[in-house]
Each structure stands twice: as C-alpha cells, then as structure tokens.
Regions:
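Extreme N-terminal starter segment of soluble prokaryotic enzymes
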Residues: 1-4
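A general, composition-driven signal for non-globular sequence regions
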Residues: 6-7, 136
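Conserved N-proximal alpha/beta basic substrate-recognition cap immediately N-terminal to
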Residues: 8-122, 126
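Short alpha-helical interface elements
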Residues: 28, 45-46, 132-133, 156-157
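ATP-grasp fold ATP-binding core
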Residues: 104-109, 132-156
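Catalytic core of tubulin tyrosine ligase-like
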Residues: 144-147, 153-177
C-alpha cells in the first residue's frame, strides 16, 4: 500500500507529513493535483491525502479565484471512479464541506464541541465597530470560503487610546483591501 500526499506545491506541512512517514518506516510520496489526475485511473493500492493548494497570494480577489479553482479540482476528483483498493484519507466531498467555515463551525457546535464565538456578519465598518466595541475584544476576520488562514485580518479596538489596530496579510489593490 502506498501513501500519496497531494497539493500544488510542497509546503512545510507536507514535508512534516513525509518525515512522519519516514519515522514510521512508511514511504509517503508527494504528487501535484495534475500528476494525480494523470495517474488516478491506473492507480492501485493507495491511500491519498489531499492538501489545500499552497499560495502566498495577498490580493483578496485573486485569493478568491484560487479558492474557486481548488473547489473545482475537488469536485472533479469527487466525480472520478477509483479502484477498490484506492481511497482518500480525506474525501473531496468532506473537504468541500470544510471549505465553508460557517457551515463547519455550525457542525462542530451541533456536535457539542467548544468553538470560538462567531459574531454576526457586519455589512459595514460601522457595524463591525459597534460589534467589537460591545464585546470588548478583538477578532479575526476570515473569508467564509477557503482553507486555512488565507485572507485573515486581525482587528482590535484599544479603548484607552481610542484607536483601531489592524494586522493583515492582504495587500491594498486600487485603494481597497
């Protein structure tokens, strides 16, 4: 049985996964999504671990396009027939569901797991300011769809200085973050 970890590029997380395999004396191979699509019809005796696409994109609009392409890749993989001795460690369908952070959080709460509180979605900065001022803490703003921390913005109000502090990985494009 072979173990294959798949993404568009190697990442530290994937390198750690491969290293863990070596520690267990199990070979773990890396493959790109393109390589997986090419070999999947003939692939036998394999467990496939799908990883999100690696990107250092800071333009939020381009990030959304990358996320859409990843969703389409997962949908395509989910429609392919696999040999009986090939399986996904994390199925394309499960990953598609997990890409919706709001739905995922609701599933976790429904199962009785403790999660960080989720504020209502503000429609303007004034609404966000009101929400944060009322709860007395900072928050992380994330896109609803996507994997990991991409597009995250940390924002906190400092009442003693009457100042808003924002940290982000996003870049300003045409005057808009």
């Amino acid at each position: 049985m072979q173990i294959i970890v798949v993404s568009n590029f190697l990442s530290k997380r994937i390198e750690y996964f491969i290293e863990a395999g070596k520690h267990l004396q199990v070979e773990v191979r890396f493959m790109t999504y393109g390589e997986l699509f090419n070999c999947l019809p003939q692939l036998r005796q394999a467990v496939i671990k799908l990883e999100p696409c690696v990107s250092d994109e800071t333009n939020f609009l381009k990030y959304a396009l990358l996320n859409q392409a990843y969703k389409e890749t997962l949908q395509r993989l989910g429609e392919m027939r696999l040999s009986d001795d090939v399986c996904f460690l994390n199925t394309p369908h499960a990953l598609l569901r997990a890409l919706d952070k709001k739905e995922t959080k609701q599933v976790l709460m429904d199962r009785g797991l403790k999660v960080t509180p989720m504020l209502p979605s503000p429609r303007s900065f004034d609404e966000l300011r009101e929400l944060l001022t009322g709860c007395g803490r900072g928050c992380f703003l994330k896109p609803r769809y996507g994997s990991g921390a991409g597009g995250v913005m940390a924002i906190r109000y400092q009442p003693n200085r009457n100042k808003w502090v924002v940290y982000t990985t996003l870049q300003q494009v045409d005057g808009v973050i």
